[in-house]
Amino acid sequence: MNDSPVLVVGLGNPGPKYVGTRHNIGFEVVEELVGRNYANFSVHKRSNTEIAQLPGLIVAKPRSFMNLSGTPIRALCDFFKISPANVLVVHDELDLDFGQVKLRQGGGDHGHNGLKSTSRSLGTKDYWKLSVGIGRPPGRMDPATFVLKPFSKQEQDSVPIMAADAADLIEEHIRTL
């Protein structure tokens, strides 16, 4: 790892309307990561994010909507002088079964508008992505509707475990940089 910190960003939508929705699993994961380190988020006005600073690590939640996440992520990279190679974005993934997590560097956005925005703003797809599986919508439900719905009662019981597993993977990954 170089001298710049690692930036871990959880994607989600701001506001109480979106708490507990599938699209906000990125927020759940970074909240777990920050909470287990006894830290708190505070507003970082220059980037329109909430951040928590840990040793060698900045954890962030954009305060913009998911599809506009790239702008605040780029602002954090510029402010803290972080290269895209030291960025890890946590996002929901329809193409992974519920509860599965997958870490990859580079690659496509899989149709995820938050990742599209991030890639556009960073000028590269060569950053780390942690996909957290939310599964496919049932029947003919529109995926855009599905991701904005709350987790089912049964799924809600698994979300804290899922967030903890993803946070474990982030911590393990950071140790290897």
Swiss-Prot record:
The record marks 13 as: Discriminates between blocked and unblocked aminoacyl-tRNA. Pfam families: Pept_tRNA_hydro (PF01195). The active site is at residue 23. The record marks 92 as: Stabilizes the basic form of H active site to accept a proton. It catalyses: an N-acyl-L-alpha-aminoacyl-tRNA + H2O = an N-acyl-L-amino acid + a tRNA + H(+). InterPro entries: Pept_tRNA_hydro, Pept_tRNA_hydro_CS, Pept_tRNA_hydro_sf. Disulfide bonds: none annotated. GO terms for molecular function: peptidyl-tRNA hydrolase activity; tRNA binding. Its EC number is 3.1.1.29. TRNA binds at residues 18, 65, 67, 113. GO terms for biological process: protein quality control for misfolded or incompletely synthesized proteins; rescue of stalled ribosome. Its main location: cytoplasm. One of its GO terms (cellular component) is cytoplasm. Signal peptide: none annotated. Keywords: Cytoplasm, Hydrolase, RNA-binding, tRNA-binding. Hydrolyzes ribosome-free peptidyl-tRNAs (with 1 or more amino acids incorporated), which drop off the ribosome during protein synthesis, or as a result of ribosome stalling. Belongs to the PTH family. Monomer. NCBIfam families: pth (TIGR00447). This is Peptidyl-tRNA hydrolase. It comes from Corynebacterium efficiens (strain DSM 44549 / YS-314 / AJ 12310 / JCM 11189 / NBRC 100395). The gene is pth.
